[in-house]
UniProtKB/Swiss-Prot annotation:
PANTHER family: 30S RIBOSOMAL PROTEIN S10 FAMILY MEMBER. This is Small ribosomal subunit protein uS10. Part of the 30S ribosomal subunit. Involved in the binding of tRNA to the ribosomes. GO terms for biological process: translation. The lineage of its organism: Bacteria, Pseudomonadati, Aquificota, Aquificia, Aquificales. It comes from Aquifex aeolicus (strain VF5). InterPro entries: Ribosomal_uS10, Ribosomal_uS10_CS, Ribosomal_uS10_dom, Ribosomal_uS10_dom_sf. Keywords: Ribonucleoprotein, Ribosomal protein.
Length: 104
C-alpha cells in the first residue's frame, strides 16, 4: 500500500522570490514534524518575442523580449494534521503561483 504524500509545485518569474518561498515552506513542514523531499528544480521555461521597433519601415530594426518562468517541486512524504494547518496559514509573496496535490 502506497503512503500518502503532498506534492507542491511552485512557479514564479523571479527565482529569488521562488527560492525564498520554498525555504519558508520547508521550514514550516520540518517545524511541524513533517519530512520533505526536494526542492526539485524543473527546467526553466523561456518564451521569446521579436517585435518591430518602427510601425512603418526600417524592417531590420527589431526588439527582442524574453520572459523566464522558474519552477520547483516539493514532496511532503510524512505529515501531521499540524503540518497541513500550518501550510494553509502560510503567506507567500504575490509573484509565486502554488499548486498543491494529494497523492497516494
Amino acid at each position: 500500500m502506497e503512503q500518502e504524500k503532498i506534492r507542491i509545485k511552485l512557479r514564479a518569474y523571479d527565482h529569488r522570490l521562488l527560492d525564498q518561498s520554498v525555504k519558508q515552506i520547508i521550514e514550516t513542514v520540518k517545524r511541524t514534524g513533517g519530512v520533505v523531499k526536494g526542492p526539485i528544480p524543473l527546467p526553466t521555461r523561456k518564451r521569446k518575442w521579436c517585435v518591430l521597433r518602427s510601425p512603418h519601415k526600417f524592417d531590420q530594426s527589431r526588439e527582442h523580449f524574453e520572459i523566464r518562468e522558474f519552477s520547483r517541486i516539493l514532496d511532503i512524504i510524512r505529515f501531521t494534521p499540524q503540518t497541513i494547518e500550518a501550510l494553509m496559514e502560510i503567506s507567500l509573496p504575490a509573484g509565486v503561483d502554488v499548486e498543491v496535490k494529494m497523492r497516494g
